[in-house]
Amino acid sequence: GVLVGAGTVRADDPRLTVRMAPAGRNPVRRMVLDARAQLPVDCALFDDIAEAPLHIFTRHDADEGDIERLESAGAHVHPVPHDAGGLDLQRVLDVAWEAGIESILCEGGARLAEALLREGRIQRLYLLIAPTTLGTGGVSAFPQDAKAVEWSAFSPACAPQVFGRDTLIVLDKEGD
């Protein structure tokens, strides 16, 4: 599966699908964390919902009308517990597992990455480093307090790979 937060959907309007998959053979299970069930049904995620399932995780006390709106558009909505820190990520992962999603690629932003790192939910990191300056509108890939992350738990899985001017570094969590 591919996991993003609602902020990424609003900012980028992604499809989260395999671009060159044969018709009817899109294997990606798309997952969005949307605490308030406010995703617009006219976003790109709903364009090919019949071919690529969309799972939306929301607070268990989200508005029933909003949940029904998303379900009527074809999404699978999963209310989960939450606290001040956001949705219960362990419950999100449990529901994903129950739905047959055994591996998840997080393409979300810094908030989601921070939560997953803080809770020790990441086994492998793919860091793609590009020589591009983002400027003032750029979004950080890591939490503001990256020092709080236990980086020593990760080690290189293979030699860095170079793609043009970009470099890919793959890190595995030790012991996993």
State where each predicted segment sits.
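Enzymes that bind and transform nitrogen-containing heteroaromatic metabolites
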Residues: 1-176
